[in-house]
């Protein structure tokens, strides 16, 4: 494609996520429900009724940023200072502009914001992982975060080399960085 300069704006919204952890679906989602949502949760309090874990369907909770842009003047925007004030959670970035024919163009991007020095998990999920580096050389240390929306969860790590178990350990799930 050919670059076209345009003006528009983008807004960032914090999304309202479920207030509890749901168990992963054990069967396909029903296309029709025989129970009301309330009756279902009374019987199956930890199971998904509909699309509660689908971030693309979560409501917007709060607009946290609204900025104009002009790609004729600037194409990169550093928002690191603004992100420092964001609370951990899932956000959607919505960009709006018009093309050279006056047609509306909308783009969406979903991001997760978290703080490695804070114990607040950004999503209500059974297991949340962050690996800043996906590959390492022998002897090199790798940092990672393994967290859970449940309390007192342990993870089992087993390291193999050429099909043989080299080591095994358990760690408590936490938003603190591990090696």
Descriptions of predicted regions:
Residues 1-179:
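C-terminal segments of large proteins
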């Amino acid at each position: 494609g050919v670059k076209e300069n345009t003006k528009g704006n983008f807004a960032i919204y914090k999304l309202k996520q479920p207030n509890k952890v749901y168990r992963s679906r054990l069967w396909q989602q029903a296309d029709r429900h025989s129970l009301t949502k309330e009756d279902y949760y009374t019987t199956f309090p930890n199971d998904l009724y509909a699309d509660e874990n689908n971030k693309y369907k979560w409501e917007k909770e709060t607009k946290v940023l609204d900025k104009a842009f002009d790609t004729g003047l600037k194409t990169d925007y550093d928002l690191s200072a603004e992100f420092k004030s964001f609370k951990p959670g899932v956000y959607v970035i919505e960009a709006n502009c018009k093309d050279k024919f006056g047609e509306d163009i909308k783009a969406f991007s979903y991001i997760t914001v978290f703080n490695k020095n804070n114990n607040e998990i950004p999503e209500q999920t059974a297991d949340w992982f962050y690996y800043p580096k996906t590959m390492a050389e022998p002897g090199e240390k790798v940092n990672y975060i393994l967290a859970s929306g449940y309390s007192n969860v342990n993870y089992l790590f087993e390291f193999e080399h050429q099909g043989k178990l080299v080591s095994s350990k358990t760690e408590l799930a936490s938003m603190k960085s591990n090696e």
